Curated annotation (Swiss-Prot):
Catalyzed reaction equations: guanosine(527) in 16S rRNA + S-adenosyl-L-methionine = N(7)-methylguanosine(527) in 16S rRNA + S-adenosyl-L-homocysteine
Name by which UniProt lists this protein: Ribosomal RNA small subunit methyltransferase G
Main location: cytoplasm
Cross-referenced CDD domains: AdoMet_MTases
Organism phylogeny: Bacteria, Pseudomonadati, Pseudomonadota, Gammaproteobacteria, Alteromonadales
Organism from which the protein derives: Psychromonas ingrahamii (strain DSM 17664 / CCUG 51855 / 37)
Keywords: Cytoplasm, Methyltransferase, rRNA processing, S-adenosyl-L-methionine, Transferase
Encoding gene (name): rsmG
Amino acid sequence: MSLLENLQKLIDQTSLEVTDQQKQQLVQLVELLNKWNKAYNLTSVRDPEQMLVKHIMDSIVVSPYLIGERFIDVGTGPGLPGLPLAILNPDKQFVLLDSLGKRLRFIRQALLELGLKNVTAVQSRVEEYQPEHKFDVVLSRAFASLHDMLYWCKHLPHEEGHFLALKGQFPAQEIKELDKEFEFVESISLQVPTLEGERCLVKIKRI
């Protein structure tokens, strides 16, 4: 079975609406990541079939919860979840931020090959990045603890903006230890087809 057919089977198990062109772009992204990974070690996931589940599906299930127009993916690594989400949301603007040059080179190549016009790749440490305009949502997928994410990223959302952290199990202890300037809003349970283990999306705002 081809990657495209496999992706279709996975998407069919969700309520996501994905166009044929977007499916092609998602598969292209996996093929490119697999190719670059052999030389640059961008992800510990080596199998393209597993990349579909652990990287693509795990990212795009967040799509229905993206409210706003401007998003920043902090500590994006090889563009996850930012690139898959940008493919599904061509009307929204994404900044993908990471401090490692090899990751940014991959992202820029992906933007070129996939023809994505709604993504800006930025090489910077998150605490040093000063955007011209604040963001509606700050996204993180593999960025340390909630405390660290909020501490380093608190200058990024505008007053009405919020934080979305993609987590495994519900991080009860981390939420209990939030600083007083932050408020836990909700945790959304995410269903990622064929992925073992829990996934949740934690929403937090500044008070």
